[in-house]
Amino acid sequence: MTDQVFDKACRACPRLATFLDDVNQRYPDYYCKPVPPFGDAAASFLIVGLAPGMHGANRTGRPFTGDHAGLLLYQMLHKYGFSTHEESLAADDELRLTNCRITNAVKCLPPDNKPVGAEINTCNAFLGNELSTLAESSVVLALGGIAHRAIIKALSLRQADYKFGHAALHDLGRFRLLDSYHCSRYNTCLLYTSPSPRDGTK
């Protein structure tokens, strides 16, 4: 069992490690490694996504940076004072987060954006350690059902007691868990997400 919140050299999931190697061959300028959490280490607001996107975090090395989902997310973070900029384009830009931290349930890019159960479980110890650093009365935002379930698992809670639902708020004792549909292009195009529902989760 690891006590880390991140391991940049992790290759514990053979399928993901092989896939990253293949992607790196096709896109040699891409980051193509486990993507670390980003933001304020002492934040009381933690955002948990699913996994790095092919041409977003997997390219730039920073969560939700350089793709459609990031455009939507950082616009909201900037609007409510958590981000210095409303666009996150590259890991070396000047964007900084205040009292906010962003991570993923799975730290490596999965094929077709779909990690399998064993991969989610392998990465779950990192997420559990990250959750353990949160202060009392913090808020965790789960972007999507997989992120929600990974959080519940990391806390050793019963999934049946905490069902995922868009805009659902769960009291987990030490902090609260807020659910939202993931702000991916796919969900947005299907009208599952839009700026107004996300505004309602502030």
Regions picked out by a protein language model, each given a short descriptive name:
Residues M1-F164, G173-T188:
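A polyanion-binding, active-site-adjacent surface
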Residues Y192-P197:
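Conserved small/polar residues in nucleotide/adenosyl-binding loops
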